[in-house]
C-alpha cells in the first residue's frame, strides 16, 4: 500500500502566494457543485475541480504539483459562479502554476520570455512594426479617399492609446486597418505607440506574478510617457483581463482606464458617429462569449456590448445557449492553445465538442468572438467537427457594414 504524504502547512503556503490572498478555500464543503458546473469534467481524465480541491485541503502538495489538472484546467472560472463558498478555483490553479517551480508546457513560457526580452510576445522588430503601420496607413488613405487620414504615432495627450495583439501586426494587418478606418470615420482622438504597443500579457497564464508585473509596468510607463489616461484593447480577451483586472493588482495602483475597442464601437453607433448598413451582413450570426472578457473581467455591462453591436450590424443574430457569463469555455483558454504537444490538440478538441454542439444548434453561418485565443480554438473546432461556418471578429462585420461618407 502506497503512503500519501500530507503537508498541512501547504494551505497556508498557498494562501500567502496568491495574488489576492484569501483563506476562503479552507471552507470548501466538498459538495461537488464545482464539478457539476465544469463543462469539461467528463470530457477527458484529470479534469475534476473537486478532486483538486480535496487534494489542496488535505495538504497533498507533492501530488498537486504533479497533477495534470493544473494545466488541463482552462481557468474559465465557471465553477466559481456556482460554488456556495465562491472559492476561486482558477486563482488557486494559477497560484500552483506560477509559485512552485513548475514550467508551463509547450510555448507558454517562451511567449512570456520573448515579451520580456523584445517588448512583444512575437518578437516583432520595431522597424518591421513601424513599416507595417506605414503601409497600413497608405491603405487607409486609399480606402477612405483621404490623403490626410493617419495612424497617429506617439501623439501625446491623445484621448486613447490603441494597443494590439502582436498577431495583428504579423498575420492580421487587416485588423489594424479596420480599426484605423473606424477611428477615422468616428473622428476619434487616438494614437498608437512606437515602443510599447503589445497589450497582451501571457504571464496571466503561467502564473508568475513577477513576470506579469514587469510586463504591466511597461504599459503603465508608456501611458505616462504619452500622457494618456485610457488604453483601448483590440479584440483580445486575455489582453483586456490582464490590463483591466491584473495591472491594478500587479502594480498596486490603477495605472490607466481600460476599454475594449468594442466599447468605442458601441459608443460610436449610439452617438451616430459611424453609420452602418446591416443588410450587408445578412447571414445568421452567433456569438461566443470569451471567458476572460465576459465572465472573468466582471466589467459592468460588458456582456451586452458585443450584442448591442451585432444587433445593429447584422440582420440575423442568434444566441447560443447558455450565453453571457454562463457560456461554456471554448476549451482553448488558460493558455491551452499554445501548450503544444504536451497539451495535445486531441484534448482541446474533446473539450471543443460542447462548443461545436452549441454552434450547430444555432444554425448560424458566422461565429463571432472578441478574442484571439478563442478564434484559434474555434477555427480548430470548425475543422474538427466539420461545422462549415466562418469564424471572425466584430470589427470585420462592422467594417463590412460601414457606410463611409
Where are these regions (language model features)?
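Cofactor-cradling patches in redox/metallo enzymes
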Residues: 167-256, 294-309, 318-405
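Iron-sulfur-cluster electron-transfer modules
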Residues: 25, 55-239, 246-250
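A short, charged/proline- and glycine-enriched loop
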Residues: 155-160, 279-285
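Short, structured patches in soluble enzyme cores that scaffold and shape functional sites
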Residues: 164, 260-262, 289-291
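A broadly conserved sequence feature marking short terminus-proximal activation segments
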Residues: 1-6, 28-52, 296-300
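An alpha-beta-alpha
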Residues: 280-292, 298
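Short cysteine clusters
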Residues: 28-34, 38, 73-79, 83, ...
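Ferredoxin-type iron-sulfur electron-transfer modules in oxidoreductases and energy-metabolism complexes
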Residues: 3-21, 43-72, 76, 86-121, ...
